[in-house]
Amino acid sequence: MLSYLTRLTGRDREEFYDDHLAHFLTFNAGAANAGGFMAFQRYTSHMTGIASASADALAIGEWQLFLAGLIAIIAFVSGAAFSAILINWGRRKNLHSQFAVPLLLESLLLAVFGFLGDWMQQFHAFYFPATALLLCFIMGLQNAMITKMSGARIRTTHITGMVTDIGIEIGKSLYWNRDPAYSTEHHVRGDRKKIRLLMNFVALFFLGGLAGGIGYNWSGFIATLFLATLLFLLAIMPVLQDIIRSNR
């Protein structure tokens, strides 16, 4: 188990471990996204909806809503940028934890959100922007980490690209390869393994959303601590490796 956790978020990457980690992170993104919606009626993991809502707000002269959306996008971009900085710094230092550190930071930020969420509700003017921006930053942090780790093969915080790729592969699978002018090596073939993988991600995002919604209704912000603990367990082994190595 310890070896598995070390390889899951460690420096040396294999497609097998990238895919396994993406399963955990997709569930986490779905849960955090749903929990955020239950808390303040906004989704924070996908920027498409936020950008569209900001454009609508600008069109009807709702400047506050427009600025809120713009700042949310900036928070997401900032999270992605900070993740890239951490990973590139870790690569420069040849750390085992170059990918684990952004996850560990995400874990700590989710824990802060879980512990302080109820307390922050008393500050109405501060509560919504602070929590929304924190979750947008967290989602940017996570999405950039798995994107860099997998060489842009996997993203976990939104499923638009996933269902698009599923449709593409289904279309390729259904293509009628009957043209005698083309040999079998040029036949169009769908990637069934990719379809299964992406369908798993979509299902886990949905299940994460279900768990996040139920968890928030049942226990409020404290439900976020489950996600924080999950990410902490995923990230801690490579970090401990680097700590032990630095003390030798």
Q: Which residue ranges define each predicted feature?
A:
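Alpha-helical transmembrane segments of multi-pass membrane proteins
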Residues: 2-248
